[in-house]
């Protein structure tokens, strides 16, 4: 039971095991493996942006007109090595505590649902912004490329905040040192989320994915926390309901027949395939 009371504070080497962070480590290694595959085997074009589009980046003109598969794939892609390094570091640091707090099944559910949901939220947000601006009537096709695990990471960060709030307020640790450490970790996570969102205000950052991932992660974790830990069937039902709601949202918003969107979709694919044909000559 001590493990459940103190997931964010490893007291001694004896309490640490590789198995306790196996899922977090697997997710980090998966992101690294996909990136190396991406740059070694899946980059036939000179343009980095075109390669990302070809491989499955989240482009709202494509994702909202049938390419729903871009949501899960884009969360495993990264634009460059620095982007990958920062995300993997954040995933490892935050994921360790989250995995020990919620367990592997819940962590995986929060990570996947938050990541895919963040990509959907980002795609629709971009469409909403542009369709309600003067850019919508412009003849230029504006492409925003969304890649990275940051939406999923924001989801597990928000879930960690929810867990620590419950621990600090409702079940404070009897040891003052551990109690202070948990408070510091809570404050640090809140500060990290706030700084990420503030940094996302600058151009070139997909802040909609950050916001969407954080909201989804928080909602799922609240549902998990409200259900007693031992009720596995109830926790499974929460996961199924969350996944079903996400699937329904994808179905409702990812098959648009908007003429303007479809024209831009055709233009983007034509440009990429032309570049691909030229590269193969």
From Swiss-Prot:
Topological type in the membrane: Multi-pass membrane protein
Biological process according to GO: proteolysis
Note: AarA deletion mutations display alterations in cell morphology and total or partial loss of yellow pigmentation.
Keyword Transmembrane helix carried by entry: yes
Reactions it catalyzes: Cleaves type-1 transmembrane domains using a catalytic dyad composed of serine and histidine that are contributed by different transmembrane domains
Protein name per the record: Rhomboid protease AarA
Signal peptide: none
Superkingdom as given in the UniProt entry: Bacteria
Bilayer-spanning residue ranges: 16-36, 76-96, 105-125, 145-165, 185-205, 208-228, 233-253
GO MF term set: serine-type endopeptidase activity; serine-type peptidase activity
Compartments where found: Cell membrane
Keyword Hydrolase: yes
Gene3D superfamilies given in the database record: Rhomboid-like
């Amino acid at each position: 039971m001590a493990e459940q009371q103190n997931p964010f504070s490893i007291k001694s080497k004896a309490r640490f095991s590789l198995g306790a962070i196996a899922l977090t480590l697997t997710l980090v290694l998966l992101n690294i493996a996909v990136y190396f595959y991406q740059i070694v085997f899946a980059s036939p074009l000179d343009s980095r942006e075109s390669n990302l589009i070809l491989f499955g980046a989240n482009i709202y003109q494509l994702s909202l007109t049938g390419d729903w598969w871009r949501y899960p794939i884009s969360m495993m892609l990264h634009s460059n090595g620095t982007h990958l390094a920062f995300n993997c570091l954040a995933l490892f640091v935050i994921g360790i505590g989250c995995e020990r707090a919620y367990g592997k099944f819940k962590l995986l559910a929060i990570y996947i649902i938050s990541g895919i949901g963040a990509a959907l939220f980002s795609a629709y947000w971009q469409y909403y912004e542009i369709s309600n601006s003067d850019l919508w009537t412009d003849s230029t096709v504006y492409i925003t490329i969304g890649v990275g695990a940051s939406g999923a990471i924001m989801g597990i960060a928000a879930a960690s905040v929810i867990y620590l709030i419950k621990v600090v307020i409702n079940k404070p640790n009897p040891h003052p040192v551990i109690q202070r450490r948990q408070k510091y970790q809570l404050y640090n996570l809140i500060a990290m989320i706030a700084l990420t969102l503030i940094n996302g205000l600058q151009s070139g950052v997909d802040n909609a994915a950050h916001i969407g991932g954080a909201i989804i992660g928080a909602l799922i974790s609240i549902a998990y926390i409200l259900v007693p830990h031992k009720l596995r069937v109830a926790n499974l039902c929460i996961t199924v309901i969350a996944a079903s709601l996400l699937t329904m949202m994808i179905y409702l918003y990812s098959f648009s027949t908007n003429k303007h969107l479809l024209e831009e979709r055709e233009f983007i694919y034509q440009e990429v395939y032309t570049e691909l044909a030229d590269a193969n000559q």
